[in-house]
Design a protein with these regions (language model features):
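Outer-membrane beta-barrel "beta-signal"
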Residues: 48, 105-172
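Residues on the lipid-exposed face of transmembrane beta-strands in outer-membrane beta-barrel proteins
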Residues: 5-9, 46-50, 75-79, 110-114
Length: 172
């Protein structure tokens, strides 16, 4: 449990943006629904985003402090298709040594999101998402969905989306 926030600076008619995220969190107890453990930390990230004109690729670099109090950066590449389906890859490198991290030496993986719009007759913001990792260790772990969420949530109103679909701007 915890509290946090995100800011996004997205200049007009730009394909890039700067973001900042900070979260103060405390670990939940494994056996109690609302119990808390003694572990507390603050995660904080500065992010640089870029929307490529090439096949709807979004690139991101997040640098900051992770849940295990390690410091480093995550590189992320995501492609979003016209129907809302997206697939991406990420790699996180931190100050945790390969010997401390163990097998795999850094956090990496693939992820995808499938919107429910493809399966239901009405418009919905629902989706199913998953992350595929070879191994998951403490190093390089972030809070899920709390870094770069604004950048991806605002995709439909970003300049790169309007530029590609100019007819959306013309009233019928």
């Amino acid at each position: 449990s915890g509290v946090g926030g995100e800011l996004l600076y997205l200049p007009f008619k730009a394909r890039w943006a700067l973001g900042a995220t900070i979260n103060a969190v405390r670990q939940r107890d494994f056996n109690k629904e609302f119990g808390l453990l003694d572990y507390e930390t603050v995660t904080a990230f500065i992010s640089l985003f870029y929307a490529s004109a090439f096949y709807n690729y979004d690139l991101a670099i997040h640098a900051g402090r992770y849940l295990a109090k390690d410091k480093g950066a995550t590189i992320e590449v995501r492609r979003t298709f016209e129907n809302g389906f997206s697939i991406g890859a990420f790699a996180t490198f931190t100050n945790v040594s390969a010997a401390e991290y163990g097998e795999g030496s850094f956090d990496k993986g693939l992820y995808f999101q499938i919107p429910f719009n493809s399966f239901v007759s009405r418009n919905t913001k629902g989706k199913v998402a998953t992350i595929l990792r070879s191994l998951q260790r403490d190093g390089g772990q972030k809070l899920d969905d709390f870094t770069g969420r604004l950048w991806h949530d605002l995709r439909s109103v970003r300049y790169d989306s309007f530029e590609k679909h100019k007819l959306r701007m013309i009233p019928k």
